[in-house]
Amino acid sequence: MAPIAVTLLTGFLGAGKTTLLRHILNEQHGFKIAVIENEFGEVSVDDQLIGDRATQIKTLTNGCICCTRSNELEDALLDLLDSRDRGEIEFDRLVIECTGMADTGPIIQTFFSHQVLCERYLLDGVIALVDAVHADQQMDQFTIAQSQVGYADRILLTKTDVAGDTEKLRERLARINARAPIYTVIHGDIDLSQLFNTSGFMLEEKVVSATPRFHFVAEKQNDVSSIVVELDYPVDISEVSRVMENLLLSFAEQLMRYKGMLWIDGEPNRLLFQGVQRLYSADWDRPWGDETPHSTLVFIGIQLPEEEIRAAFAGLRR
């Protein structure tokens, strides 16, 4: 049985998550999507089920499933599986709305720390909605607003129709998260394919930083930022493992997400890795072939010691 793809929908208070969810829950888009949201909105309901753990599940007229929880996320996820396995509901994708002040890290780790959830669900990606009108002020005042951007695989910029010029905001978002592309969404109307198949938590060959890349100093320094490390020389696998272990020992609480492609000395294949806080994985990818071997690593975190991280990898040069 193929695992169920999961998309996390994050964003600060007022960013437009509810508007986007209303679009998902009401449009005739043909997807079989289950949505875990904080509160039910005005949606057309065909049926209502009460799960074993007080998880309220509603089947909607467009075939989507709407689920609200008065308990832990883990229990709600298990309730959905139970209802699906009993044939009471049918869905092949899950979208989870995170609260406006939610820390995305522990929610991500839920899908890697529970055996059943790890087997039955596949975390596809994190989508962050950003209010173009108020984002700068929110990110200045609340580190959590920056963190939501830092964890994202894709960023959806909302309210651009009333915000005016967003170029500086886009530059700031790119400094926080160098790997997430930025899209514009107006009133929640978006091609749902932009929400899905990000492969954000899969080991894949596409490890690049967003373009253009900015090198000027921001007027206000972000607490959350991204560091892109590029190496044009091979590294020893045991030495790079030591560097990563030391980074995790020292800065695991600050590291949010990291992803990379490594040129390992003496190996014809590329080594891919990705991680969230203390959890990470690595695997061999395809041969380099005609591509010039190199290493690219992207670290996103809170007040990361950039000089120390760069020096640690520079020390791998032989």
Locate the predicted segments by residue.
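Structural motif
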Residues: 86, 118, 144-147, 219
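Charged, alpha-helix-enriched surfaces in structured cytosolic catalytic cores
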Residues: 4, 15, 19, 68-75, ...
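Flexible active-site lid/hinge loop adjacent to a nucleotide/diphosphate
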Residues: 132, 136-151, 155
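Nucleotide-state-sensitive switch-loop elements of NTP-binding domains
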Residues: 2-138
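C-terminal engagement modules used by replication, chromatin/transcription, nuclear envelope/ESCRT
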Residues: 290-300
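Short amphipathic alpha-helical segments
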Residues: 92, 223-227, 295-297
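C-terminal accessory "lid"/substrate-recognition subdomains
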Residues: 147-289, 302-318
